[in-house]
Amino acid sequence: MNKESKGMLIGFVGILIFSLTLPVSKIAMLTFDPYFIAFGRACLAGLVALGYLAYKKAPLPSKKDLAKYIVIALGIVFGFPILTTLAMKEGSSSHGAVILGMMPLASTVIGVLRFKERPSLGFWFVSLFGATLVVVYALLKSAGSVTYIDGLLVFGGICACVGYVEGGELSRRVNPRIVISWSLAISLPINIVMTYLTFNADYWMADAIALTSFLYLSLFSMFLGFFFWYEGLAIGGIARVSQVQLIQPFCTLLAASILLGDHLTTLNVVFAFLVISTVILSKKMLVQRN
């Protein structure tokens, strides 16, 4: 197995973990406030990450890398969780799943601008086609207009892509598990304060389903998923492996159907299938890495 295929396979494991984030967030919001979910899950993940760093006796980040960790944290610890959780307060996880299908293109663009990866024209065409499918889907679902929920999802997706690209590149020379751990750890002071401010005493009475959902968002969506995702990006390249994210909408649609009882409409399935097809095509396109 070559590096690109290995990177895509490892990255796919991370995507499977991430694909449950939106439907599980919907379940958690039946009990918890959206802001508590966003900050609380990062707080718990940060505490676990701090313990992991202590166990591994990881050295402190260098001054050069500290700026990268801050950018990563702004993207995946704050931006994406806050914006997408707010979107899920009123939007459906099925709708959000397909809108976030634009993330591979965003990751590719950021990778090209930041790290001079050079995808072929064919790769760009396939990526743009996949992103166009997502836009068309959004317009069809909202009677020809883009809603503020779409805006939250798009900006949240861009935040995540910035964190993905910076983290994936840093993981080429720093252990991917250390990268996500430090990103969470340096965010702890803010997340501890915000978790305290958004906590409600009624949360002590949360049922097992709510607690399990919160734990999944904290330990898997915010922490363990990045073990695989960052390693996949580092091995296979940002532009190539980021295309695996196009499979995430279909995985999320299935999860929403099973966990929430969301109906798998013909429109959802058709567009998810078309988007996944672009992943298969992109695998055949040339991407040069510097």
Where in the sequence are the language-model features?
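Membrane-interface helix-cap regions at the ends of transmembrane helices
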Residues: 20, 24-27, 31, 45-61, ...
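Specific transmembrane alpha-helical segments of multi-pass solute transporters/efflux pumps
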Residues: 17, 21-22, 50-96, 100, ...
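Helix-helix packing/entry segments at the starts of transmembrane helices
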Residues: 38-40, 81, 95-102, 166-188, ...
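Hydrophobic/small/kink-forming positions within alpha-helical transmembrane segments
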Residues: 16-19, 23, 50, 74-78, ...
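C-terminal transmembrane-helix exit sites in multi-pass transporters
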Residues: 48-58, 84, 103-125, 250-270
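Hydrophobic transmembrane alpha-helices of multi-pass small-molecule transport proteins
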Residues: 49, 70-72, 102, 119-139, ...
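Transmembrane alpha-helical segments that form core, pore/gating elements
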Residues: 49, 107-109, 113, 144-200, ...
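Glycine-/small-residue-enriched transmembrane alpha-helix faces in small-molecule transporters
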Residues: 1-36, 142-169, 290
